[in-house]
A protein has these predicted regions:
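PP2C/PPM-type serine/threonine phosphatase catalytic domain
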Residues: 1-279
Length: 279
């Protein structure tokens, strides 16, 4: 499945991609730009479905020039580019929704472009609410048609992490939900700088927030034979959050982890972004 550099959404002008590409094991086809835009000199994208799956839940957005909503002033509209990776899990529906819509939720906020961090927070919240409402309504309708009261098998449990880079004029805004990472290469590749922080259940800030909101953090244990045949050993799995059983503490979607009617808690696994600004 080709998920690399999807069409430029909502009327945004696309740029020609070099037909030459590199094939990597277990990766989709890697593609790169032959033309930049403003301070963006080049860009590239690639996703990897992994070794154990025959499907890919990751999605990519690359929009070099976000289209100005009609109700926004042309005079105040800046040059803005949007790059995002959506690391889907439990299905691709949530990642698909974010790829197609998240940038529009951000730029349509009243606070955009005067206050980009506020617009990002508000846009993320609206996108989350909209997606959960779609999933809930679809499940309710399907259950009603079948006369079913148990939601098992009727609810779209997909979710997604998100790492977003929004470039407005000369400022870079990095917004993170989950454990997808943004890094920056500097000094000719000799230095690598982290631009985001992973949202993991066992990370101190996240652990405090989870437990204060009545969530639980646990770690699975698996007993396996030792390689040398001398007995067994205990293998610890990743830290996870209940409700949700996720190994990340922030995500979009994941309705069963969030809506009380499905046993969730909206304050435990959240879609609140952590935002960093770079000049």
């Amino acid at each position: 499945m080709n998920l690399i550099v999807e069409s430029f959404l909502e009327g945004d002008e696309g740029y020609c991609l070099d037909p030459d590409h590199v094939i990597l094991p277990n990766h989709d086809e890697a593609r790169h730009s032959t033309k930049g835009s403003g301070m963006i000199q080049a860009y590239a994208a690639n996703t990897n479905q992994g070794v154990f799956r025959n499907y890919n839940e990751d999605r990519v957005s690359i929009i070099l020039n976000i289209t100005r909503p009609k109700f926004k002033s042309e005079e105040d509209w800046p040059t803005c580019s949007f790059f995002a990776v959506y690391d889907g899990h439990g299905g691709a529906s949530c990642a698909d929704f974010l790829r197609d819509n998240l940038h529009q939720f951000i730029v349509k906020q009243e606070s955009f472009p005067s206050d980009p961090p506020a617009a990002i927070r508000e846009g993320f919240a609206e996108a989350e609410s909209f997606f959960l409402e779609i999933v809930e309504n679809a499940a309710d309708e399907a259950m009603a048609e079948q006369g079913e009261t148990n939601h098992d098998g009727y609810v779209d449990n997909s979710g997604s992490c998100a790492i977003v880079i929004l470039i407005i004029n000369q400022k870079v805004y990095v917004a993170n939900v989950g454990d997808s990472r943004a890094i920056m290469s500097a000094n000719g590749g000799r230095d690598v700088l982290s631009l985001s922080r992973d949202h993991k259940p066992n990370e101190e800030v996240e652990a405090v927030r989870i437990t204060e909101n009545r969530g639980k953090i646990y770690q699975t244990q698996t007993i396996v034979p030792k390689m040398d045949g001398t007995g067994n050993e205990c293998i610890l799995g990743p830290h996870r959050v209940f409700p949700g059983r996720l190994s990340v503490s922030r995500s979009f979607g994941d309705i069963e982890a969030k809506l009380p009617k499905y046993g969730g808690n909206m304050q435990v696994i959240v879609s609140v972004p952590e935002i960093r600004v770079f000049d």
